[in-house]
Amino acid sequence: MAEITKADVISFIEKMSVLELAEMVKELEEKFGVSAAAPVAVAAVAGPAAAEAAEEKTEFDVILKAAGANKIGVIKVVRALTSLGLKEAKDLVDGAPQPLKTGVSKEEAEEAKKQLVEAGAEVEIK
């Protein structure tokens, strides 16, 4: 069996359409649990402006860090919170750390965290 070189891969990718490339990137992100988004450097804001920016945060992300010992219980809570199917919820829990809910209110994020922690999960709110 011939070995595939980087040049072969690049040649193959060059022939793909933009839509095919976008789908491939999405599949690679899901397969390897990474994001293709470039990191964004943000300049530090000094003084009161920084405090105001921190206080104004209205959208939060609930990140499932780890399932803990009660994986089945965590999967049940994930299904209830996200309305995912059993396989999708299990894949999400198995792939931790993963974002569970994004852009939700502080109250909703805290409630989701409470339910997940009660089920034995390790959760972070960003």
UniProtKB/Swiss-Prot annotation:
Please name the InterPro entries in this protein's record.
Ribosomal_bL12 (IPR000206), Ribosomal_bL12_C (IPR013823), Ribosomal_bL12_C/ClpS-like (IPR014719), Ribosomal_bL12_oligo (IPR008932), Ribosomal_bL12_oligo_N_sf (IPR036235)
Q: Does the record's keyword annotation contain Ribosomal protein?
A: yes
* A cellular-component GO term for this protein: cytosolic large ribosomal subunit
> Which of UniProt's keywords are assigned here?
Ribonucleoprotein, Ribosomal protein
Which GO terms label this protein's molecular function in UniProt? Answer: mRNA binding; structural constituent of ribosome
Q: Which Pfam families match?
A: Ribosomal_L12, Ribosomal_L12_N
Among Gene3D superfamilies, the record links this protein to: 3.30.1390.10, Single helix bin
Q: Which GO terms describe its biological process?
A: translation
Question: Belongs to which family?
Answer: Belongs to the bacterial ribosomal protein bL12 family.
Quaternary structure (record)? Homodimer. Part of the ribosomal stalk of the 50S ribosomal subunit. Forms a multimeric L10(L12)X complex, where L10 forms an elongated spine to which 2 to 4 L12 dimers bind in a sequential fashion. Binds GTP-bound translation factors.
PANTHER family (alphabetical)? 39S RIBOSOMAL PROTEIN L12, LARGE RIBOSOMAL SUBUNIT PROTEIN BL12M
HAMAP family in UniProt = Ribosomal_bL12
Physiological role: Forms part of the ribosomal stalk which helps the ribosome interact with GTP-bound translation factors. Is thus essential for accurate translation.
Its name, as the record gives it, is: Large ribosomal subunit protein bL12
The organism is Geotalea daltonii (strain DSM 22248 / JCM 15807 / FRC-32)
